[in-house]
Amino acid sequence: MSQIHKHAIPANIADRCLINPEQYEAKYQQSINEPDTFWGEQGKILDWITPYKKVKNTSFAPGNVSIKWYEDGTLNLAANCLDRHLQENGDRTAIIWEGDDATQSKHISYRELHRDVCRFANTLLELGIKKGDVVAIYMPMVPEAAVAMLACARIGAVHSVIFGGFSPEAVAGRIIDSSSRLVITADEGVRAGRGIPLKKNVDDALKNPNVNSVEHVVVLKRTGGKVDWHEGRDLWWSDVIEKSSADHQPEEMNAEDPLFILYTSGSTGKPKGVLHTTGGYLVYAATTFKYVFDYHPDDIYWCTADVGWVTGHSYLLYGPLACGATTLMFEGVPNWPTPARMAQVVDKHQVTILYTAPTAIRALMAEGDKAIEGTDRSSLRILGSVGEPINPEAWEWYWKKIGNEKCPVVDTWWQTETGGFMITPLPGATELKAGSATRPFFGVQPALVDNEGHPQEGATEGNLVITDSWPGQARTLFGDHERFEQTYFSTFKNMYFSGDGARRDEDGYYWITGRVDDVLNVSGHRLGTAEIESALVSHPKIAEAAVVGIPHNIKGQAIYAYVTLNHGEDPSPELYTEVRNWVRKEIGPLATPDVLHWTDSLPKTRSGKIMRRILRKIAAGDTSNLGDTSTLADPGVVEKLLEEKQAIAMPS
């Protein structure tokens, strides 16, 4: 970008921060040079039944990828998230639930959550679920989803949470792969005023002849909508939990016992069941939550992610609850029924830390000041961003409009497979640059390598790898360790390959440039699609953009840009020329888009990620096999884009 914005650490943060710049340097050096000492100390953030003596036992060696942390220690995750807080903070609010309908909200104390989790843990045992069994959870954003997850952890069952937006086919595939014995769902979900037929989707999934492991379906009554009922298989949540005792002793788990499976889409083939274990994962989720959000006991914390994604696991539930925090769970969407809904929720609950995604920020940005109308957001002190690289323009808007120019923005880079934050600012220790994830978290050793795996020193760019293990790292892919090794450790030997590219600037700050397959090669020059998208979105009339490469006879690849304009703006030949020149000015002639495709909407998954694979195929005119579109929030978008494409003159 033509300009680097730099933000100093605000005085109000510096005065009471947990980690200042000097402490960051000292702790980071210790975490790299003496990982056993550092993580041995950090492990004390949890209560252990049998204290660990071993800390780190890991290998990234070809043919021998093995990751173990705290392997001789025992603990229980639910006891760390609930029981240990009861004596001093039992009446503290654990979960604030804000419904899709703004008139519905409730506060659940640690004591109440503990009671419900114990009762549901006993329910699971009565249904024959035991330590090591897999339970599929396909729930809306309601407190019972958290109860189900914590109850599984309490008895040692492995949960596999499936995002409530996934299709019956996707649900069936995940149940089959994990051999889930029980499904927990609701009659319906509610989102932006619309019902989501969760129970019907489960019924359809269970009709798949390859689903033969499921014994029962527990159904929460969320809306009271009509559902089909399978006597003997289906059970109402309220019926089973009412009969269960609130007295339950948590199961003693080894640190390396499986905690959950979370499916993430592979670049090829079927989804991968990423497996996380108990001890190292929770140490990492709690430590990263505490330091990255500079958590203080009076904070009200809101992570907007769904429980169906890893962000919902680590930073809506487990990290905050392990630290005894108050976490807000929101059933709705940030811009419904009004563009100011997110800001209204902040004011209503006096939220101090807000963690959301660039896709939400850009949607609000397109609404302009309507996104903050009638709100003051004065309670906020820290903002966070997750899910994809945030373009500097959206970062600045978020900082300025949502945070009133006083809240540091922690732009966190991490993945389902990492369990927690990897590259991220710390509010009291890091000067910020809009669009940069900045520096590695404690114990994280990033490197940039070329395509042959040679490390690149200094200010440079390359493939982002991690050269040594950290406690939150996924241990394997469920039932397929060979694929785990193949996917993450075979491209570059003795290193974990993230699949992302990044550049490092003169200050050692990292800038994520997007997936490596989202890098264009135009006339022999590498261009990150994120960089071009950022330039496009910095245009005052553009709300969102997605850039892909298309084959070009001379340049190798040409640049094809899908562009969504702000409300009230219309495409015109003049604007077409203006936008192309704008990018040329921002980045250089090489980055000038060859094609602008005006469109009202882009194909997105329900978590807000743009499906670039589909955009690449549409742009290239290759519509023979668009692959699985079941995870799209609105599959109709694809048809519309194909129609629009017909009218576009393509470069030769």
From Swiss-Prot:
Record's catalysed reaction(s): acetate + ATP + CoA = acetyl-CoA + AMP + diphosphate
Annotated binding of Mg(2+), by residue: V537, H539, I542
Sites where the protein binds CoA: R191, A192, G193, R194, T311, N335, S523, R584
Record keywords, A-Z: Acetylation, ATP-binding, Ligase, Magnesium, Metal-binding, Nucleotide-binding
One GO molecular-function entry: ATP binding
Cofactor: Mg(2+)
Any single GO CC term annotated in Swiss-Prot or TrEMBL for this entry: cytosol
Binding site for ATP: G387, E388, P389, D411, T412, W413, W414, Q415, T416, D500, R515, R526
NCBIfam families in UniProt: Ac_CoA_lig_AcsA (TIGR02188), PRK00174.1 (NF001208)
Family: Belongs to the ATP-dependent AMP-binding enzyme family.
Protein's recorded name: Acetyl-coenzyme A synthetase
Native source organism of the sequence: Citrobacter koseri (strain ATCC BAA-895 / CDC 4225-83 / SGSC4696)
Gene name as annotated: acs
